[in-house]
Amino acid sequence: MEINKVEQLTDNHNQLLLLADPNQLLVDDYAQRGTVYEATEDETLVGIMVLLPTRPETIELVNIAVVEAHQGKGIAQKMIAFALQTAKQSGFHTIEVGTGSIGFEQLYLYQKCGFRMVAIDRDFFVRHYEEPIIIENGMVLQDMVRLSQDL
């Protein structure tokens, strides 16, 4: 698997970003302000992520998604390891990520990669998404869990 910086977003990139975040306006905003990386296997797109500096020594992993057919193969874990290394080499001291409070697999993955929970942003998904309800694991998604890791 290779991970490389994306210079120009394609429709395939955009569709994969929307898999993790269905708000096109938010995706467009942070993809333009951040750095987008793609993961490929045999020149086929299998994953994507966006890193966005948020404060002088802090960067956030604002989106990470793996093509559904390639999920469960450790791709996201390798991408997160790449993000941690890239952030550290770029001089950042902290990396943050936010995810849905009922995204059990995501919460497990981030903690497995060394992130620790630091806050809950109550009603984040209610405030920022036009869809009346986002259902995940059979529950209505309302809150965002914020996690961070010192580099």
Model features per residue range: what roles?
Residues 3-69, 80-81, 150:
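Acetyl-CoA-dependent GNAT
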Residues 34, 141-146:
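Short hydrophobic/aromatic beta-strand or adjacent loop that forms the aromatic wall/cage
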Residues 67-69, 73, 102:
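Active-site acidic-Proline motif in GNAT/NAT acetyltransferases
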Residues 72-85, 112:
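Conserved acetyl-CoA-binding loop-helix of GNAT-fold acetyltransferases
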Residues 87-99:
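Conserved GNAT acetyl-CoA-binding A-motif
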Residues 97-107, 122-128:
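Conserved beta-strand-loop-alpha-helix junction that forms the acyl-donor binding cleft
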Residues 109-110, 115:
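Conserved active-site tyrosine of GNAT-family acetyltransferases
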Residues 118-143:
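Short, flexible, glycine-rich and Lys/Arg-enriched loop motifs at helix boundaries
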